[in-house]
Protein backbone atom coordinates (compact mmCIF):
# COMPACT_ATOMS: atom_id res chain seq x y z
CA UNK A 1 0.00 0.00 0.00
CA UNK A 2 1.52 3.36 -0.89
CA UNK A 3 1.71 6.03 1.76
CA UNK A 4 -0.51 9.08 1.48
CA UNK A 5 1.25 12.39 2.02
CA UNK A 6 -0.21 15.31 3.91
CA UNK A 7 -2.46 15.68 6.92
CA UNK A 8 -5.48 15.96 4.62
CA UNK A 9 -4.88 12.48 3.23
CA UNK A 10 -3.93 13.84 -0.20
CA UNK A 11 -1.15 12.61 -2.44
CA UNK A 12 0.53 14.62 -5.14
CA UNK A 13 0.62 12.52 -8.29
CA UNK A 14 3.79 14.31 -9.41
CA UNK A 15 5.66 12.73 -6.50
CA UNK A 16 4.20 9.24 -6.73
CA UNK A 17 6.59 6.28 -6.52
CA UNK A 18 7.08 3.93 -9.42
CA UNK A 19 3.78 2.50 -10.58
CA UNK A 20 4.79 -1.04 -9.72
CA UNK A 21 5.17 -0.06 -6.05
CA UNK A 22 2.05 2.04 -5.64
CA UNK A 23 -0.66 -0.47 -4.78
CA UNK A 24 0.13 -3.68 -2.96
CA UNK A 25 -2.23 -6.65 -3.40
CA UNK A 26 -3.76 -5.69 -0.03
CA UNK A 27 -4.51 -2.05 -0.82
CA UNK A 28 -8.14 -1.85 0.14
CA UNK A 29 -9.23 1.36 1.85
CA UNK A 30 -11.32 -0.55 4.38
CA UNK A 31 -11.24 -3.21 7.07
CA UNK A 32 -13.92 -5.88 7.30
CA UNK A 33 -16.20 -5.69 10.31
CA UNK A 34 -19.03 -8.09 9.47
CA UNK A 35 -19.82 -10.84 6.93
CA UNK A 36 -20.77 -9.51 3.51
CA UNK A 37 -19.44 -6.04 4.24
CA UNK A 38 -16.29 -4.35 3.01
CA UNK A 39 -16.07 -2.79 6.46
CA UNK A 40 -15.27 0.77 7.47
CA UNK A 41 -13.90 2.71 4.52
CA UNK A 42 -11.65 5.75 4.39
CA UNK A 43 -11.79 8.03 1.35
CA UNK A 44 -8.41 8.85 -0.17
CA UNK A 45 -7.26 11.63 -2.45
CA UNK A 46 -4.80 11.81 -5.32
CA UNK A 47 -3.67 14.82 -7.35
CA UNK A 48 -3.15 14.28 -11.07
CA UNK A 49 0.29 15.39 -12.31
CA UNK A 50 -0.84 16.98 -15.57
CA UNK A 51 -3.59 19.31 -16.83
CA UNK A 52 -6.61 17.86 -18.59
CA UNK A 53 -7.84 19.27 -21.90
CA UNK A 54 -11.65 19.42 -21.83
CA UNK A 55 -14.16 19.14 -24.65
CA UNK A 56 -15.05 22.82 -24.20
CA UNK A 57 -11.49 23.71 -25.19
CA UNK A 58 -10.26 24.75 -21.76
CA UNK A 59 -7.63 23.07 -19.61
CA UNK A 60 -8.05 22.38 -15.92
CA UNK A 61 -5.31 21.98 -13.34
CA UNK A 62 -4.75 21.02 -10.60
CA UNK A 63 -7.17 18.10 -10.38
CA UNK A 64 -7.75 16.21 -7.16
CA UNK A 65 -9.54 12.85 -7.28
CA UNK A 66 -11.39 11.37 -4.31
CA UNK A 67 -11.46 7.58 -4.39
CA UNK A 68 -12.15 4.42 -2.42
CA UNK A 69 -11.15 0.81 -3.08
CA UNK A 70 -12.67 -2.47 -1.96
CA UNK A 71 -11.11 -5.92 -2.23
CA UNK A 72 -7.65 -7.09 -3.21
CA UNK A 73 -5.72 -6.15 -6.33
CA UNK A 74 -4.36 -9.22 -8.11
CA UNK A 75 -0.61 -9.45 -8.78
CA UNK A 76 -1.35 -9.11 -12.51
CA UNK A 77 -3.58 -6.06 -11.85
CA UNK A 78 -6.25 -7.60 -14.05
CA UNK A 79 -9.22 -7.84 -11.67
CA UNK A 80 -10.19 -4.16 -11.41
CA UNK A 81 -13.80 -3.00 -11.65
CA UNK A 82 -14.43 0.74 -11.83
CA UNK A 83 -17.79 1.76 -10.37
CA UNK A 84 -19.20 5.10 -11.57
CA UNK A 85 -21.85 7.02 -9.68
CA UNK A 86 -24.99 8.86 -10.78
CA UNK A 87 -25.75 12.59 -10.59
CA UNK A 88 -26.46 12.74 -6.86
CA UNK A 89 -24.01 10.01 -5.86
CA UNK A 90 -20.46 10.26 -4.62
CA UNK A 91 -17.24 8.37 -4.02
CA UNK A 92 -18.57 6.31 -1.11
CA UNK A 93 -20.10 3.30 -2.84
CA UNK A 94 -19.76 0.52 -0.26
CA UNK A 95 -19.16 -0.17 3.40
CA UNK A 96 -19.39 2.26 6.28
CA UNK A 97 -17.75 5.66 5.88
CA UNK A 98 -15.05 6.41 8.42
CA UNK A 99 -16.31 10.00 8.40
CA UNK A 100 -20.10 9.91 8.13
CA UNK A 101 -21.89 12.51 5.99
CA UNK A 102 -24.13 15.16 7.53
CA UNK A 103 -26.94 13.60 5.51
CA UNK A 104 -27.31 10.18 3.97
CA UNK A 105 -25.93 9.67 0.48
CA UNK A 106 -28.13 6.59 0.10
CA UNK A 107 -30.61 7.53 -2.59
CA UNK A 108 -33.53 5.38 -3.58
CA UNK A 109 -37.18 5.48 -2.64
CA UNK A 110 -37.72 5.22 1.14
CA UNK A 111 -33.99 4.72 1.73
CA UNK A 112 -34.35 5.87 5.33
CA UNK A 113 -37.00 3.23 5.99
CA UNK A 114 -34.71 0.59 4.49
CA UNK A 115 -31.40 1.58 6.09
CA UNK A 116 -32.37 3.08 9.44
CA UNK A 117 -29.67 4.89 11.39
CA UNK A 118 -26.86 3.19 9.42
CA UNK A 119 -27.84 5.02 6.23
CA UNK A 120 -25.75 8.09 6.99
CA UNK A 121 -22.52 6.12 6.71
CA UNK A 122 -23.49 3.31 4.32
CA UNK A 123 -22.27 3.38 0.71
CA UNK A 124 -24.83 4.14 -1.98
CA UNK A 125 -24.38 0.72 -3.69
CA UNK A 126 -23.45 -1.32 -0.64
CA UNK A 127 -25.92 -4.04 -1.59
CA UNK A 128 -24.00 -4.64 -4.82
CA UNK A 129 -20.37 -4.40 -3.66
CA UNK A 130 -18.75 -6.75 -1.17
CA UNK A 131 -17.87 -10.39 -0.49
CA UNK A 132 -20.25 -12.64 -2.40
CA UNK A 133 -22.22 -9.72 -3.81
CA UNK A 134 -22.73 -8.72 -7.45
CA UNK A 135 -19.31 -7.07 -7.60
CA UNK A 136 -17.60 -9.69 -5.48
CA UNK A 137 -14.67 -8.24 -3.57
CA UNK A 138 -13.38 -11.76 -2.91
CA UNK A 139 -12.65 -11.86 -6.64
CA UNK A 140 -12.46 -8.27 -7.85
CA UNK A 141 -10.69 -5.09 -6.80
CA UNK A 142 -13.43 -2.46 -6.97
CA UNK A 143 -12.53 1.21 -7.38
CA UNK A 144 -14.96 4.10 -6.89
CA UNK A 145 -14.23 7.76 -7.58
CA UNK A 146 -16.08 11.03 -7.24
CA UNK A 147 -16.54 12.35 -10.78
CA UNK A 148 -14.96 15.51 -12.19
CA UNK A 149 -17.11 18.49 -11.23
CA UNK A 150 -18.20 16.77 -8.04
CA UNK A 151 -18.49 18.16 -4.54
CA UNK A 152 -17.35 15.17 -2.50
CA UNK A 153 -13.59 15.43 -2.81
CA UNK A 154 -12.88 15.61 -6.55
CA UNK A 155 -12.17 18.97 -8.15
CA UNK A 156 -15.35 20.84 -8.98
CA UNK A 157 -16.96 24.29 -8.83
CA UNK A 158 -16.42 24.54 -5.06
CA UNK A 159 -12.66 23.90 -5.45
CA UNK A 160 -10.12 26.70 -5.41
CA UNK A 161 -9.34 28.27 -8.78
CA UNK A 162 -5.54 28.72 -8.80
CA UNK A 163 -5.90 31.81 -10.99
CA UNK A 164 -7.91 33.69 -8.37
CA UNK A 165 -7.35 31.93 -5.07
CA UNK A 166 -11.13 31.69 -4.67
CA UNK A 167 -13.61 28.91 -5.44
CA UNK A 168 -14.33 28.49 -9.15
CA UNK A 169 -18.09 28.86 -8.86
CA UNK A 170 -19.52 29.51 -12.32
CA UNK A 171 -15.99 30.08 -13.67
CA UNK A 172 -15.52 26.31 -13.57
CA UNK A 173 -15.31 24.99 -17.15
CA UNK A 174 -18.34 23.27 -18.64
CA UNK A 175 -17.70 19.54 -18.65
CA UNK A 176 -18.97 16.45 -20.48
CA UNK A 177 -19.30 12.80 -19.55
CA UNK A 178 -16.29 12.16 -21.78
CA UNK A 179 -14.29 14.63 -19.68
CA UNK A 180 -15.26 12.69 -16.56
CA UNK A 181 -14.05 9.46 -18.14
CA UNK A 182 -10.75 10.95 -19.35
CA UNK A 183 -10.17 12.10 -15.78
CA UNK A 184 -10.87 8.59 -14.51
CA UNK A 185 -8.42 7.21 -17.07
CA UNK A 186 -5.71 9.65 -15.93
CA UNK A 187 -6.37 8.71 -12.31
CA UNK A 188 -6.05 4.98 -12.99
CA UNK A 189 -2.82 5.63 -14.89
CA UNK A 190 -1.38 7.08 -11.68
CA UNK A 191 -2.40 3.93 -9.81
CA UNK A 192 -0.68 1.75 -12.40
CA UNK A 193 -3.93 0.21 -13.62
CA UNK A 194 -3.88 -0.15 -17.40
CA UNK A 195 -6.86 -2.39 -18.05
CA UNK A 196 -10.29 -2.79 -16.46
CA UNK A 197 -12.10 -6.06 -16.03
CA UNK A 198 -15.31 -4.04 -16.03
CA UNK A 199 -16.78 -0.56 -15.76
CA UNK A 200 -20.17 -0.46 -14.07
CA UNK A 201 -22.76 2.08 -13.06
CA UNK A 202 -26.38 3.08 -13.04
CA UNK A 203 -27.93 6.12 -14.71
CA UNK A 204 -25.11 8.63 -15.35
CA UNK A 205 -22.76 5.89 -14.19
CA UNK A 206 -23.92 3.74 -17.09
CA UNK A 207 -23.23 6.61 -19.47
CA UNK A 208 -19.67 6.71 -18.15
CA UNK A 209 -19.37 2.97 -18.74
CA UNK A 210 -20.28 3.42 -22.41
CA UNK A 211 -17.88 6.35 -22.77
CA UNK A 212 -15.16 4.05 -21.47
CA UNK A 213 -16.08 1.37 -24.01
CA UNK A 214 -16.00 3.86 -26.88
CA UNK A 215 -12.98 5.96 -25.86
CA UNK A 216 -10.81 3.09 -24.62
CA UNK A 217 -12.00 -0.05 -26.43
CA UNK A 218 -8.77 -1.97 -25.85
CA UNK A 219 -8.69 -1.23 -22.13
CA UNK A 220 -12.14 -2.41 -21.01
CA UNK A 221 -13.16 -6.08 -20.95
CA UNK A 222 -16.80 -5.59 -19.93
CA UNK A 223 -19.32 -2.90 -19.10
CA UNK A 224 -22.41 -3.10 -16.91
CA UNK A 225 -24.89 -0.30 -17.62
CA UNK A 226 -27.99 -0.29 -15.43
CA UNK A 227 -31.00 2.02 -15.91
CA UNK A 228 -29.01 4.00 -18.44
CA UNK A 229 -29.20 5.07 -22.08
CA UNK A 230 -27.26 6.23 -25.13
CA UNK A 231 -28.91 9.68 -24.97
CA UNK A 232 -31.42 11.08 -22.51
CA UNK A 233 -34.87 11.65 -24.04
CA UNK A 234 -36.28 15.19 -24.64
CA UNK A 235 -38.54 14.86 -21.60
CA UNK A 236 -35.48 14.12 -19.48
CA UNK A 237 -33.67 17.13 -20.96
CA UNK A 238 -36.69 19.25 -20.06
CA UNK A 239 -36.90 18.04 -16.45
CA UNK A 240 -33.20 18.71 -15.98
CA UNK A 241 -33.66 22.20 -17.40
CA UNK A 242 -36.45 22.92 -14.90
CA UNK A 243 -34.22 21.78 -12.04
CA UNK A 244 -31.30 23.94 -13.18
CA UNK A 245 -33.53 26.97 -13.68
CA UNK A 246 -34.82 26.62 -10.13
CA UNK A 247 -31.23 27.06 -8.92
CA UNK A 248 -30.43 29.88 -11.34
CA UNK A 249 -33.57 31.79 -10.31
CA UNK A 250 -32.64 31.72 -6.62
CA UNK A 251 -31.16 35.16 -5.73
CA UNK A 252 -28.78 33.40 -3.36
CA UNK A 253 -27.11 31.70 -6.32
CA UNK A 254 -25.36 35.07 -6.85
CA UNK A 255 -24.16 34.24 -10.33
CA UNK A 256 -22.56 31.08 -8.99
CA UNK A 257 -20.20 32.95 -6.67
CA UNK A 258 -21.96 32.23 -3.40
CA UNK A 259 -19.12 30.51 -1.55
CA UNK A 260 -18.05 32.35 1.58
CA UNK A 261 -20.97 34.80 1.47
CA UNK A 262 -23.04 33.10 4.14
CA UNK A 263 -25.83 32.56 1.62
CA UNK A 264 -26.30 29.70 -0.82
CA UNK A 265 -29.20 28.78 -3.11
CA UNK A 266 -30.84 26.24 -0.83
CA UNK A 267 -34.36 27.17 -1.94
CA UNK A 268 -33.60 26.65 -5.62
CA UNK A 269 -31.50 23.58 -4.91
CA UNK A 270 -34.32 22.12 -2.85
CA UNK A 271 -36.79 22.57 -5.69
CA UNK A 272 -34.28 21.02 -8.10
CA UNK A 273 -34.05 18.02 -5.80
CA UNK A 274 -37.84 17.73 -5.61
CA UNK A 275 -38.11 17.79 -9.40
CA UNK A 276 -35.27 15.33 -9.86
CA UNK A 277 -36.52 12.97 -7.18
CA UNK A 278 -39.99 12.75 -8.71
CA UNK A 279 -38.45 11.80 -12.06
CA UNK A 280 -36.63 8.94 -10.32
CA UNK A 281 -39.91 7.45 -9.05
CA UNK A 282 -43.13 6.22 -10.66
CA UNK A 283 -46.83 6.93 -10.28
CA UNK A 284 -47.30 3.39 -8.98
CA UNK A 285 -44.68 3.65 -6.26
CA UNK A 286 -45.87 7.07 -5.11
CA UNK A 287 -49.46 5.88 -5.04
CA UNK A 288 -48.59 2.78 -3.05
CA UNK A 289 -46.58 4.64 -0.43
CA UNK A 290 -48.58 7.85 -0.07
CA UNK A 291 -51.86 7.68 -1.94
CA UNK A 292 -53.72 10.90 -1.19
CA UNK A 293 -53.15 10.61 2.54
CA UNK A 294 -53.13 13.91 4.39
CA UNK A 295 -50.20 15.07 6.45
CA UNK A 296 -52.61 15.64 9.33
CA UNK A 297 -55.03 12.75 9.46
CA UNK A 298 -57.96 14.67 10.88
CA UNK A 299 -58.58 17.08 8.00
CA UNK A 300 -57.12 19.63 5.60
CA UNK A 301 -55.74 22.82 7.15
CA UNK A 302 -56.58 25.31 4.39
CA UNK A 303 -52.99 26.48 3.85
CA UNK A 304 -51.15 27.33 0.66
CA UNK A 305 -47.70 27.43 2.27
CA UNK A 306 -47.43 24.21 4.29
CA UNK A 307 -47.63 20.56 3.18
CA UNK A 308 -51.17 19.20 3.28
CA UNK A 309 -50.39 15.76 1.82
CA UNK A 310 -47.82 13.23 2.97
CA UNK A 311 -46.18 13.21 -0.45
CA UNK A 312 -45.62 16.97 -0.17
CA UNK A 313 -43.95 16.55 3.20
CA UNK A 314 -41.78 13.77 1.77
CA UNK A 315 -40.54 16.07 -0.98
CA UNK A 316 -39.75 18.79 1.55
CA UNK A 317 -37.74 16.29 3.57
CA UNK A 318 -35.85 15.23 0.43
CA UNK A 319 -35.03 18.86 -0.33
CA UNK A 320 -33.92 19.72 3.19
CA UNK A 321 -31.61 16.71 3.48
CA UNK A 322 -30.13 17.06 -0.02
CA UNK A 323 -28.97 20.66 0.37
CA UNK A 324 -26.93 19.61 3.42
CA UNK A 325 -24.72 17.31 1.36
CA UNK A 326 -24.72 18.56 -2.23
CA UNK A 327 -23.43 21.68 -3.94
CA UNK A 328 -25.79 23.57 -6.24
CA UNK A 329 -23.10 24.37 -8.81
CA UNK A 330 -22.10 20.72 -9.01
CA UNK A 331 -25.75 19.94 -9.71
CA UNK A 332 -25.78 22.51 -12.54
CA UNK A 333 -22.60 21.23 -14.17
CA UNK A 334 -23.35 17.53 -13.80
CA UNK A 335 -26.94 17.91 -14.98
CA UNK A 336 -25.72 19.76 -18.07
CA UNK A 337 -23.10 17.09 -18.77
CA UNK A 338 -25.60 14.24 -18.77
CA UNK A 339 -27.94 16.11 -21.11
CA UNK A 340 -25.06 16.63 -23.56
CA UNK A 341 -24.37 12.89 -23.60
CA UNK A 342 -25.37 11.42 -26.98
CA UNK A 343 -23.27 8.56 -28.33
CA UNK A 344 -24.68 8.78 -31.86
CA UNK A 345 -24.02 12.52 -32.11
CA UNK A 346 -20.60 12.36 -30.49
CA UNK A 347 -19.13 9.34 -32.24
CA UNK A 348 -21.39 8.18 -35.06
CA UNK A 349 -22.45 11.24 -37.05
CA UNK A 350 -26.01 10.47 -35.94
CA UNK A 351 -25.72 6.68 -36.16
CA UNK A 352 -25.68 4.65 -32.95
CA UNK A 353 -24.35 1.64 -34.84
CA UNK A 354 -21.40 3.65 -36.13
CA UNK A 355 -20.78 5.11 -32.68
CA UNK A 356 -20.44 1.63 -31.18
CA UNK A 357 -18.51 0.05 -34.05
CA UNK A 358 -15.15 -0.08 -32.25
CA UNK A 359 -16.52 -1.31 -28.93
CA UNK A 360 -14.91 -4.60 -27.92
CA UNK A 361 -16.21 -4.87 -24.36
CA UNK A 362 -18.83 -7.43 -23.45
CA UNK A 363 -21.96 -5.55 -22.44
CA UNK A 364 -24.61 -6.20 -19.80
CA UNK A 365 -27.67 -3.95 -19.95
CA UNK A 366 -30.33 -3.93 -17.23
CA UNK A 367 -33.44 -1.76 -17.53
CA UNK A 368 -36.66 -1.44 -15.56
CA UNK A 369 -40.22 -1.50 -16.83
CA UNK A 370 -41.40 1.52 -14.80
CA UNK A 371 -38.39 3.76 -15.51
CA UNK A 372 -39.84 6.66 -17.50
CA UNK A 373 -36.74 8.87 -17.16
CA UNK A 374 -34.41 6.31 -18.77
CA UNK A 375 -37.00 4.01 -20.35
CA UNK A 376 -36.12 0.45 -21.43
CA UNK A 377 -36.28 1.55 -25.07
CA UNK A 378 -32.87 3.19 -24.68
CA UNK A 379 -31.30 -0.06 -23.52
CA UNK A 380 -33.13 -1.97 -26.24
CA UNK A 381 -31.70 0.40 -28.87
CA UNK A 382 -28.21 -0.08 -27.47
CA UNK A 383 -28.62 -3.86 -27.52
CA UNK A 384 -29.96 -3.81 -31.09
CA UNK A 385 -27.05 -1.68 -32.32
CA UNK A 386 -24.49 -3.93 -30.63
CA UNK A 387 -26.13 -7.07 -32.04
CA UNK A 388 -26.12 -5.54 -35.51
CA UNK A 389 -22.37 -5.26 -35.11
CA UNK A 390 -22.06 -8.83 -33.84
CA UNK A 391 -21.00 -7.71 -30.36
CA UNK A 392 -21.44 -9.70 -27.16
CA UNK A 393 -24.42 -8.08 -25.42
CA UNK A 394 -26.93 -9.24 -22.83
CA UNK A 395 -30.15 -7.34 -22.02
CA UNK A 396 -32.53 -7.82 -19.09
CA UNK A 397 -35.69 -5.81 -18.48
CA UNK A 398 -36.91 -6.21 -14.91
CA UNK A 399 -40.58 -5.75 -14.11
CA UNK A 400 -40.52 -3.50 -11.05
CA UNK A 401 -42.64 -0.57 -9.82
CA UNK A 402 -40.10 1.91 -8.47
CA UNK A 403 -39.13 3.86 -11.59
CA UNK A 404 -35.56 4.96 -12.23
CA UNK A 405 -34.65 4.33 -8.59
CA UNK A 406 -34.95 0.59 -9.24
CA UNK A 407 -31.21 0.41 -9.89
CA UNK A 408 -30.70 1.35 -6.23
CA UNK A 409 -33.58 -0.73 -4.86
CA UNK A 410 -33.71 -3.95 -6.89
CA UNK A 411 -30.27 -5.13 -5.81
CA UNK A 412 -31.43 -8.68 -5.07
CA UNK A 413 -32.78 -9.13 -8.59
CA UNK A 414 -29.83 -7.48 -10.31
CA UNK A 415 -27.20 -9.43 -8.41
CA UNK A 416 -27.56 -12.85 -10.10
CA UNK A 417 -27.61 -11.20 -13.53
CA UNK A 418 -24.35 -9.39 -12.82
CA UNK A 419 -22.77 -12.43 -11.16
CA UNK A 420 -23.59 -14.72 -14.08
CA UNK A 421 -22.35 -12.14 -16.58
CA UNK A 422 -19.04 -11.66 -14.76
CA UNK A 423 -18.67 -15.42 -14.22
CA UNK A 424 -18.19 -15.77 -17.99
CA UNK A 425 -15.19 -13.48 -17.73
CA UNK A 426 -11.68 -14.81 -17.27
CA UNK A 427 -9.69 -13.06 -14.57
Regions found by a protein language model. Name each.
Residues 389-427:
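Catalytic active-site module of serine/aspartate enzymes centered on a nucleophile-bearing elbow/loop
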Residues 346-352, 375-385:
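Short alpha-helix in the alpha/beta-hydrolase fold that links the catalytic acid
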Residues 225-321:
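Alpha/beta-hydrolase-fold enzymes
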Amino acid sequence: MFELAGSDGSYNGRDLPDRGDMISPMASTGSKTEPGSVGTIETRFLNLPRPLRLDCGREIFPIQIAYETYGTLSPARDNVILVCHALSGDVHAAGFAKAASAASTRDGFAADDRDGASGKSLGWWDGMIGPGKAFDTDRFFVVSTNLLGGCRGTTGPSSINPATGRPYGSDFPVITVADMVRTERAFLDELGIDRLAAVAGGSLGGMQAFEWAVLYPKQVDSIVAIASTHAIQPQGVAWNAIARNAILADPDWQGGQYYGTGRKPDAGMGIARMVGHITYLSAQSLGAKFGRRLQFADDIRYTITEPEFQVENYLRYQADSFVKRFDANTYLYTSRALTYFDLARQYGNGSLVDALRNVSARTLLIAFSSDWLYPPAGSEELAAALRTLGKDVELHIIEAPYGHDCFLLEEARQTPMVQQFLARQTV
